[in-house]
Amino acid sequence: MELNGVEIEDTFAEAFPIKISRILITAATKRWATVAAQEATGFGTSVIGCPAEAGIEKYADASETPDGRPGVYIQFCTFGFKSLEEQLLERVGQCILTAPTTAVFNGLPDAEKQFDTGRKLKYFADGTESETEVGGRKMHVIPMMEGDFLVEDTLGAVTAIAGGNFFIFGDTQMTTLTAAENAVDAIGAVDGTITPFPGGIVASGSKAGANKYKFLKATANEKFCPSIKDKVEGSEIPADVNCVYEIVINGLDFESIAKATEMGIRAAVAVPGIKKITAGNYGGSLGPHKFNLHDLF
């Protein structure tokens, strides 16, 4: 099938289960909420080499937050609840508590799984901590040099989905980059999803394992590398394609990732010079969740 004259390959993106925690950071200004969110989600591109995948989900107006201040929702993703709890404690403690004017609220208050992250962070106050209530939520108050840091008693987590994806094939690097940027912007409007790679874009799509260097668990996906398309047997790169970017999507449920994939692809194919959209899968061996591209439209 074609969308806006661009081929949409009849294939599927293969995704897998992941544990996700979602939190809300508020601050005196949107700038400082954003700074804290960016710091907390750093080194969070891929579980191939990072302790968690992480990203900004969406911004919240002051009218939408428990303390009436600008906010940012972020997500952290790991394979197990134990490692997720560890990442929450470390990232909130080192990257958000340390940032000016911030507070942290539970982004999944109805989740069955709740971590006592706030209850543990209160010990930083070394006996000067107290409790209060904000918007009906139990908060721990930690006195600090600038004033008080507030963190909700518990932070929730759920079993969700990671690894939704699609590939954008373009005639030039700048054309393809523009399409990828537009795709990420469109996905940003879909609640419950993040694009964890830098700026939401993967420049270095990988394959599982290695052909030559067996000590590596992931290596360059040479069949999708345009600069060696004439040298690699079975290259997936057409003659008129000179750049490929991958968009990876994690989310709280199947429906939100499906919607994000659709919105992202629609935005990408609106850019002149885009030649093809496809997706990455391992024939069903990676995970149970399949996002068939043709079914999205």
Curated annotation (Swiss-Prot):
GO molecular function (one): formylmethanofuran-tetrahydromethanopterin N-formyltransferase activity
What this protein catalyses is: N-formylmethanofuran + 5,6,7,8-tetrahydromethanopterin + H(+) = N(5)-formyl-5,6,7,8-tetrahydromethanopterin + methanofuran
Q: Which domain of life is it from?
A: Archaea
Task: Please state what class of enzyme this protein is.
Answer: transferase
What's the stated role of this polypeptide? Catalyzes the reversible transfer of a formyl group from formylmethanofuran (formyl-MFR) to tetrahydromethanopterin (H(4)MPT) to produce 5-formyl tetrahydromethanopterin (5-formyl-H(4)MPT) and methanofuran (MFR).
Enumerate the subcellular locations listed in this protein's record, separating them with semicolons.
Cytoplasm
Instruction: Tell me which InterPro entries the record gives.
Output: ForMFR_H4MPT_ForTrfase, ForMFR_H4MPT_ForTrfase_C, ForMFR_H4MPT_ForTrfase_fd-like, ForMFR_H4MPT_ForTrfase_N
Sorted alphabetically, which SUPFAM superfamilies does this protein's record hold? Answer: Formylmethanofuran:tetrahydromethanopterin formyltransferase
Question: Which family does the UniProt entry place this protein in?
Answer: Belongs to the FTR family.
Q: What is this protein called?
A: Formylmethanofuran--tetrahydromethanopterin formyltransferase
Instruction: Provide a GO biological process annotation.
Output: methanogenesis, from carbon dioxide
Q: Which UniProt keywords apply?
A: Acyltransferase, Cytoplasm, Methanogenesis, One-carbon metabolism, Transferase
Organism for this UniProt entry:
Methanococcoides burtonii (strain DSM 6242 / NBRC 107633 / OCM 468 / ACE-M)
Detail the disulphide connectivity of this chain as listed in its UniProt entry.
none
Query: What is a single cellular component term in the Gene Ontology annotation?
Result: cytoplasm
The pathway this protein participates in, as annotated, is: One-carbon metabolism; methanogenesis from CO(2); 5,10-methenyl-5,6,7,8-tetrahydromethanopterin from CO(2): step 2/3
Q: Does the keyword Cytoplasm apply?
A: yes
For this protein, what is the EC number?
2.3.1.101
* Complex and partners: Homotetramer.
Concerning Pfam families, the annotation shows:
FTR, FTR_C
Chief location bin: cytoplasm
